[in-house]
Amino acid sequence: MNSLKRYKIIFLVPIFEREDCVEDLIQNIHTICPNSAILFHINSNCSQTFVDNINKLKNHYDFCYILPEKYPSEWASGFLTNIYIQMMNWCIENDISDYIYITHSNSLLINPKLESFIYSHEIFFPLPGTKHSGDWWEKILLDQNILDYVKPLGDMIYVTSIEGAAMNLKVAQHFVDDLIKVIPNINVEYPSEEYYIPTSFMKIKDRYRYMNCALERWGHTVDHVVNGYKLGVSKNEEYILNIVLNNQFDVLSKLNLYSIKKIERKYNYPFRELLRNHFGYNNVIF
C-alpha cells in the first residue's frame, strides 16, 4: 500500500553535478508547480560527497525522492533508457502522481500554468523522425537489442529528444511494459533514450490523446518559432525571459512552452538569477 503523498506531476531528473544548481532546480520546480514532486537519479560515478549532499536536499525538501538504483548517466552511455524506465516504474509502483514529466538537471520551469494544462492530454511527445544513418548509426547497428526490438516494426528506428515529454501513469505503464525487458543494461555508447523511447511511443501513440510536442525547448539557440518573430535575439532564453518578466504566461502557453533546457550549471548564471528574482525563490542549503 502506498504511503507517500500524491502529487499532480512528478519530474524525473537525472543528476550528476553541482549541488547548488540541483537545489536551484528544486526551488524552481516547487515555486512554479507547488503541487508537484521530483524524483532524482544519481549517477553511479558521482562522489560519495555528492551523494551525501543530495540526501541532505532530499531530507530537507519532503517532495524530493531518490531512485534507489544507480547507473552511469552520462548522455552517450546508453543507460538513460534504463534510468527513465526504472524511474517510471518507481512512480507507478508508488502511485505518486497523476503525471510524469521528463526533464534534466540543466532545465528550468518558466510557466506556472503547467499544473493545470497538463491534464488536457494523456501524453505530450514530439512526433519522432526515422533513423537510417548519420550520428551514432554505427553504434546502433552494434546494439542487437534494438535491432531485435524493431523487427516487428519493419526495422524502423525512430529518434527524437525526450526532455519535455510528459504522460499520465497509464501511458507510463505501457512504456514500462514495452521496454523493461529489452532496454540495454550495458554501455552501448549512444544516447539510447532518444531511440528506444521514441520507437516505443510510435507503437502506442494512437491508443491515447496525445499532443505532438515537447513542453520543453532549447534555451541556447533560436528555433523557427522565435526566429519567425524577427526580434534579433540570439537565444530563445532572451525572448522567453521578456515574456516571463512581463508575466505573459498565456503567450508561453500558446507556444506549448513550459520549461527550457541547456541552462548553464552555474548558480550565478544570469538567466537563473533573473528567474529567482522574478519568482522569489533562493537556495537555503547550498
Predicted region positions:
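N-proximal low-complexity "stem/linker" segments adjacent to membrane-targeting elements
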Residues: M1-E23
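Short, acidic, metal-binding catalytic loop of nucleotide-sugar glycosyltransferases
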Residues: Q27-S36
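Active-site-proximal specificity loops/subdomain of glycosyltransferases
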Residues: F50-S97
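Conserved glycosyltransferase catalytic-site signature
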Residues: S77-I85, S107, Y190-P198
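Conserved catalytic core of nucleotide-sugar-dependent glycosyltransferases
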Residues: L108-I186, Y190, E194
